[in-house]
């Protein structure tokens, strides 16, 4: 009897133990690639990559990931499929599942990803929606784990427990209560993390996601409008653009609302002395983060970007039959 297919639309689609397993496997795959060892563990698998939103990191990392695992990617942009011409999502889902072993979608409405998953008989991965960005936060958590566990150069010795390491540090989010903030809230609720978020009034995270995360009874989630309060003594600082894709018309209003929320050196200095800085990219330097910080010693942004590849390989290995 075939096992029921799994989707990855939200961090809550996995358990804390499964998430830790994915992070550990992502680290193994990182070292395997550094050693230039072949790791074609999913030969012949076909992955559909559907993009209603433009992409750099998501497209390249998923395409490289499936190819290095021995599979192939079929890439569909907004003008390449009937989705952009009004075909029902459920029809696209059923057809793509007949051709491919998995579907990754990067779109605006989270309901699109949910409907694809509902009707596709193969795993569906959320490459980004306006509500959530679980693949990015999976890579972010891998980055935090590797940095804290001092495993950036060698896997020698027994690797520290993933969940213990992740729970040993305190996290801060500064900026828009967007899909990244929402997903960090999910991470806190799932893994039991200590998370503070600083967002301006009227730009808070999704209330339902916040309630669900708090409802787990795990971790600590604190909301404030004071960036300095949020970062004080924290070990991990994260931010994102103030005007996400699709919000460009609000850019000027958002710049005014987010005055004082820029992750600059003064704000970083209020965090723990060994704090690390994350940014999912692309960055608008001088707006949500300064050039000095993103290029500075606290930044782990480039390893974070690379880890999208390794984390998504681990995810594809786990999800694809």
Positions of predicted regions on the chain:
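Rossmann-like adenosine-cofactor binding region
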Residues: 214-292
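Glycine-rich phosphate/diphosphate-binding loop of Rossmann-like nucleotide-binding domains
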Residues: 52-65, 149-151, 161-239
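Positively charged, low-complexity intrinsically disordered leader regions
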Residues: 1-60, 64
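A short, gly/pro- and small-residue-rich
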Residues: 112-129, 249-271, 297-298
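Short, structured coil segments at secondary-structure junctions
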Residues: 69, 99, 119-120, 191, ...
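Phosphate/diphosphate ligand-binding glycine-rich loop within oxidoreductases
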Residues: 36, 40-145, 285
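Adenosine-phosphate binding glycine-rich loop
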Residues: 274-275, 280-321
């Amino acid at each position: 009897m075939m096992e029921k297919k799994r989707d990855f639309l939200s961090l809550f689609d996995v358990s804390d133990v499964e998430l830790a397993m994915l992070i550990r496997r992502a680290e193994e795959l990182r070292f395997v690639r550094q050693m230039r060892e072949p790791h074609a563990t999913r030969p012949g698998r076909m992955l559909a990559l559907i993009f209603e939103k433009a992409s750099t990191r998501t497209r390249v990392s998923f395409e490289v990931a499936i190819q290095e695992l021995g599979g192939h990617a079929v890439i569909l942009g907004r003008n390449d499929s009937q989705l952009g011409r009004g075909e029902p999502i459920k029809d696209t889902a059923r057809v793509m599942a007949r051709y491919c072993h998995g579907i990754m979608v990067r779109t605006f409405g989270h309901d699109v990803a949910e409907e694809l998953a509902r009707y596709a008989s193969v795993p569906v991965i959320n490459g980004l929606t306006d509500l959530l960005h679980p693949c990015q936060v999976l890579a972010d958590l891998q980055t935090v784990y590797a940095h804290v566990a001092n495993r950036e150069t060698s896997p020698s010795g027994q690797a520290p427990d993933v969940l213990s390491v992740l729970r040993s540090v305190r996290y801060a989010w500064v900026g828009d209560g967007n899909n990244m903030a929402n997903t960090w809230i999910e991470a806190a609720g799932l893994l039991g993390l200590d998370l503070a978020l600083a967002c301006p009034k009227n730009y808070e995270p999704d209330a339902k996601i916040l309630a669900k995360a708090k409802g787990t009874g795990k971790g600590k989630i604190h909301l404030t409008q004071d960036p300095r309060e949020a970062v004080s003594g924290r070990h991990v600082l994260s931010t994102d653009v103030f005007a996400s894709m699709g919000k460009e018309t609000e850019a000027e209003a958002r710049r005014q609302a987010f005055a004082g929320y820029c992750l600059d050196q003064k704000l970083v200095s209020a965090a723990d002395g060994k704090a690390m800085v994350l940014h999912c990219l692309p960055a608008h330097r001088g707006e949500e983060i300064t050039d000095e910080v993103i290029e500075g010693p606290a930044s782990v942004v480039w390893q974070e970007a690379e880890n999208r590849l390794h984390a998504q390989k681990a995810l594809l290995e786990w999800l694809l039959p």
